[in-house]
């Protein structure tokens, strides 16, 4: 079993670019059809480590879905981000839904 470093709803930062993001899903290993060289950075070990679906914001504040290796991410220690409140709200909403899922008929 592969253990992931980050959880769904957790805020993370891209190590190189510094962008804030929220984890929305986790794959135990790279799961796209055919990996591009820049996505796995010529390191085959990355392919067999956890990969994360992360929502980040572009320069205009629009949500962007990214697919990143665990090695590309750091945990985010800061709770509030006044410059990106929508990502704080998304993280809180996801965590709330995981704690109290809605029952469906």
UniProtKB/Swiss-Prot annotation:
InterPro entries according to UniProt: Hemimethylated_DNA-bd_dom, Hemimethylated_DNA-bd_sf, HspQ
Localization terms from the record: Cytoplasm
Disulfide bond annotation, renumbered to this chain: none
A Pfam family the protein falls into: YccV-like
Top-level taxon in the UniProt lineage: Bacteria
Keywords associated with the record: Cytoplasm, Stress response
Start and end residues of each stretch annotated as Disordered: 75-105
GO annotation, cellular component aspect: cytoplasm
SUPFAM superfamilies: YccV-like
Annotated GO biological process: response to heat
GO molecular function, one term: DNA binding
Record function comment: Involved in the degradation of certain denaturated proteins, including DnaA, during heat shock stress.
Family of the protein in this entry: Belongs to the HspQ family.
Protein name in the entry: Heat shock protein HspQ
Organism expressing this protein natively: Serratia proteamaculans (strain 568)
Taxonomic placement: Bacteria, Pseudomonadati, Pseudomonadota, Gammaproteobacteria, Enterobacterales
